[in-house]
């Protein structure tokens, strides 16, 4: 009895200590106390009868500890364990409520930059509050307010006037709460003050506050930062001061900002601060010091930011979910774009600046490649990797269902299972992993001789306090590296007005897509020519002189320019650089470090064409029969390899008879049989890692409206896709008939030299800040493929078949490299005449195809009657979209 009493007293003492310690900076030091308290909880069991021996409290405290030290996966899992633990039967107030635990999960989501998860948790909390608000203390209310502001600040929700007015009212209520709690509960007052600070910051940066209101909110933030931030501990105080400094920078008040950033640094120096917080602090400090003409100190702070980014990358490599990885690396990417703007003004060595770029461009892609390299090396538990992949495939199917069919009730349950395995993956990830040494010298050695690299890098321009800009300006630094057998030189070119270039790039791409679908009018075509010339003038003309004499040009665009057909940019469509150079698109020139110098080790070819999308039915009425007027505009009868979002929803997927002809042609050159019709299942692709060449001719999809996540909505369609879209039932042989970029990214395709996607939009990429290739190309890049050839817009079925036949003649018979073979094939397609098509029996082959619709048959006959010297595919819409990407 005496021993039990002693243990009980020990448990009560630890409970009191931990109740205070886990809420503050002392949490870092309390792990031994937590471990002992956990042992006592196990000793007494669930039904101890003692109020202070509380397993739910213990699990929540463990979550707080791991969150404080930056182990977010572990924190998340312990909070979830706490939620699953039953409350004490006594219902004592010493229990940690569901509300508090869910709010802790909200904090994890904020730190992971996962607004989708945060929004779901806040929605759950709102529902709980409507049912019973008894567990919602003032502090809970303040934390919810903070989370809601984060959703608007991140852009996940769009701030409107009505919401802004509500936020203004919230500030008044919060101010009253601060006064109410100031004497009795200083910490509660401080929590209210933090919510005030975040809400005020959001309004100051918006268009919905008057100048007088902004001034008032600035004074309020100043008061909060000075009087309440210290109460919350050094780490949070540092973050709040850095946040206030950022707002002062936005207002161009760099003197005031300097005071806040100094205070933030003092708080940070007194404790351990997560790298993401430090990166934000040093980024703001670099901007402030540069504005105040302390350039060398600014550069030192900028380099500290880069050190923090490196630490984040080494930590976040443990994320096996690319969607979450992109989200969490976005913070780091923004920090780099900002501090690089400072570094380039201070450092004049182009090789040094170039090294900053190749180490920090497209950070999520780089981190994902390093992670995949570890997985593929076999250093991790293979059974765990298989379990995770199976869970990810299941989640990908559910995500695809949400995009193309309907939402699924299984989604949250499956996602939670995956999150648990992600935590296990992070725990198992080798701590002694050595990452690729990315240096300018290493990349110089790997760049192929007798070629040019053109590396575009977006950055935010740094400003001076005495000449502030009305808004943040963006520009491109372009590094041009010429490599011969004996020399490797670098030049840097500055291209200003990046925001305007991005806008014009999007417009140019949109017109090309409209023209490919025969929907562009004369005004569109006139605008296209203006944009062609202006984009050439801005993006290529400044560097074209350095490309003279070099056939191969490795282009590494940034942002939406990755979707730009550079080879047709020129003063006019009759003077294009694609006639002078062989352009190959790369994500970043550091990727030469990840690929092999020689040919890939795979053997044989996988060839798929014209899948039977709807099984057990002879034919599917083509869309042309429903919209014949529109179809008459299509030279080859409307068999474009694209389905729109609505088409997929309506299960109206036309067959692609020319893609079967194409597959048979490719088979002849490769000496391999092809899979067509019902045999063209997705499983062939998902199990093709030992092949050297992969050719897929099918429908492709990409969400041009950017309403969905391209990891799941960027996809290829295979046999059975129509059945799944109609009834939602996947089968063992055919699955759901859809392969997403996400599924492909988890394959091991290091043996594959070339993937050819003869499908619409297969080459399109989402403009995601921390990613370069984000779509089907990004999926194959992550899987380890060396080259991908695909189309940026709607691909004409007949023209694609002719192009691909010539491509494989050049690639297989003439042994040209994929980029050189594609360039030769595009040149051939532009110039091939009706007579030459007849001589190669293209019209006879097409007309003998039994799946050809009557409209397509009429179009082929009409084409065959054209004058013999007529070049039917001279227009760039037939060939310019096909792009060669080198991924590794």
Regions found by a protein language model. Give the residues of each.
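"A position-specific structural signal for the A-helix of alpha-solenoid helical repeats
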Residues: 12, 16, 54, 61, ...
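Residue signature of alpha-solenoid helical repeat architecture, marking inter-repeat boundaries
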Residues: 8, 49, 53, 93-96, ...
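Amphipathic alpha-helical segments of tetratricopeptide repeats
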Residues: 38-46, 83-90, 123-130, 172-182, ...
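Catalytic cores of enzymes
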Residues: 432-888
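Residue at a conserved register position within TPR or TPR-like alpha-solenoid repeats
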Residues: 21, 66, 109, 203-205, ...
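Alpha-helical solenoid repeat scaffolds used for protein-protein interaction
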Residues: 219, 226-227, 231-235, 239-242, ...
């Amino acid at each position: 009895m005496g021993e039990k009493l002693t243990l009980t007293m020990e448990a009560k003492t630890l409970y009191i200590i931990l109740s205070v310690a886990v809420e503050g900076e002392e949490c870092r030091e309390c792990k031994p106390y937590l471990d002992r308290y956990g042992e006592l909880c196990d000793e007494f069991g669930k039904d101890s009868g003692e109020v202070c021996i509380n397993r739910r409290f213990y699990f929540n405290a463990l979550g707080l500890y791991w969150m404080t030290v930056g182990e977010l996966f572990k924190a998340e899992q312990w909070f979830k364990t706490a939620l699953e633990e039953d409350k004490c039967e006594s219902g004592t107030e010493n229990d940690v409520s569901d509300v508090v635990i869910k709010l802790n999960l909200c904090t994890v989501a904020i730190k992971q930059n996962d607004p989708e998860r945060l929004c779901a948790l806040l929605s759950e909390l709102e529902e709980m509050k409507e049912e019973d608000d008894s567990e919602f203390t003032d502090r809970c209310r303040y934390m919810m307010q903070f989370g809601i502001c984060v959703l608007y600040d991140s852009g996940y929700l769009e701030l409107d006037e009505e919401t802004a007015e509500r936020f203004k009212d919230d500030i008044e209520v919060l101010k009253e709460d601060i006064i109410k709690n100031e004497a009795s509960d200083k910490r509660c007052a401080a929590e209210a003050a933090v919510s005030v600070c975040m809400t005020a910051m959001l309004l100051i940066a918006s268009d919905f506050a008057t100048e007088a209101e902004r001034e008032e909110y600035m004074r309020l933030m100043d008061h909060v930062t000075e009087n309440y931030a210290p109460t919350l501990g050094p780490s949070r105080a540092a973050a709040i001061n850095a946040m206030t400094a950022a707002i002062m920078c936005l207002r161009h008040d760099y003197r005031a900002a300097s005071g806040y950033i100094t205070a933030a640094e003092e708080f940070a120096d007194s404790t351990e601060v997560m790298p993401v917080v430090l990166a934000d602090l040093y980024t703001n400090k670099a901007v402030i010091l540069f504005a105040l003409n302390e350039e060398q100190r600014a550069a030192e702070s900028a380099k500290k930011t880069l050190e923090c980014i490196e630490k984040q990358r080494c930590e976040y490599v443990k994320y096996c979910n690319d969607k979450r990885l992109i989200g969490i690396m976005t913070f780091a990417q923004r920090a780099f774009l900002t501090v690089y703007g400072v570094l380039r003004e201070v450092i004049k060595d182009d090789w040094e600046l170039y090294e900053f770029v190749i180490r920090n461009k497209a950070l999520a892609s780089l981190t994902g490649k390093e992670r995949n390299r570890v997985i593929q090396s076999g250093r991790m538990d293979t059974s765990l990797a298989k379990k995770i992949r199976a869970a990810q495939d299941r989640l990908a199917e559910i995500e695809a269902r949400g995009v193309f069919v309907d939402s699924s009730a299984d989604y949250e349950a499956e996602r939670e299972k995956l999150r648990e395995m992600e935590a296990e993956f992070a725990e198992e990830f080798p701590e002694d992993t050595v990452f690729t040494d990315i240096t300018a010298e290493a990349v110089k050695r790997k760049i192929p001789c007798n070629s040019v690299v053109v590396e575009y890098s977006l950055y935010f321009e740094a400003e001076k306090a005495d000449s502030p800009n009305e808004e943040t300006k963006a520009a491109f630094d372009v590094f041009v590296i010429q490599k011969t057998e004996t020399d490797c030189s670098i030049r840097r070119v500055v291209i200003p007005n990046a925001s305007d270039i991005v806008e014009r790039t999007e417009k140019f791409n949109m017109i090309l897509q409209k023209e490919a679908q025969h929907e562009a009018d004369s005004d569109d075509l006139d605008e296209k020519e203006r944009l062609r010339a202006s984009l050439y003038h801005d993006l290529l003309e400044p560097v074209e002189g350095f490309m003279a004499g070099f056939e191969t040009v490795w282009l590494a665009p940034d942002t939406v320019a990755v979707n730009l057909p550079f080879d047709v940019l020129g003063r006019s469509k009759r003077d294009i650089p694609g006639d002078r150079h062989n352009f190959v698109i790369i994500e970043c020139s550091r990727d030469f470090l990840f690929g092999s110098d020689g040919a890939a080790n795979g053997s044989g070819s996988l060839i798929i064409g014209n899948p039977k999308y709807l099984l057990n039915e002879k034919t599917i009425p083509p869309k042309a029969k429903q919209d014949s007027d529109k179809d008459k505009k299509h030279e080859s009868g409307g068999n474009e390899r694209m389905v729109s979002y609505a088409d997929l929803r309506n299960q109206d997927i036309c067959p692609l008879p020319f893609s079967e002809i194409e597959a048979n042609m490719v088979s002849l050159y490769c000496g391999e049989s092809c899979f067509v019709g019902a045999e063209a299942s997705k499983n062939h692709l998902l199990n093709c890692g030992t092949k050297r060449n992969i050719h897929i001719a099918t429908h492709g999809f990409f969400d041009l409206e950017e309403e969905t996540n391209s990891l799941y909505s960027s996809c290829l369609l295979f046999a059975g896709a129509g059945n799944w879209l109609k009834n939602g039932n996947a089968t063992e042989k055919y699955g759901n008939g859809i392969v997403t970029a996400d599924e492909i990214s988890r394959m091991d395709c290091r043996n594959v030299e070339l993937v050819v996607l003869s499908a619409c939009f297969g080459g399109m990429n989402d403009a995601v800040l921390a990613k370069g290739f984000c779509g089907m190309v990004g999926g194959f890049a992550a899987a380890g493929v060396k080259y991908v050839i695909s189309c940026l817009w709607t691909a004409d079925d007949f023209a694609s078949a002719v192009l691909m036949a010539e491509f494989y003649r050049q690639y297989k018979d003439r042994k040209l490299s994929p980029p050189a073979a594609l360039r030769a094939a595009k040149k051939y397609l532009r110039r091939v005449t009706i007579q030459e098509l007849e001589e190669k029996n293209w019209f006879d082959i097409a007309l003998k195809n039994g799946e050809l619709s009557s409209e397509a048959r009429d179009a082929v006959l009409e084409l065959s009657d054209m004058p013999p010297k007529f070049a039917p595919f001279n227009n760039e819409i037939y060939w310019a979209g096909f792009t060669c990407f080198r991924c590794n």
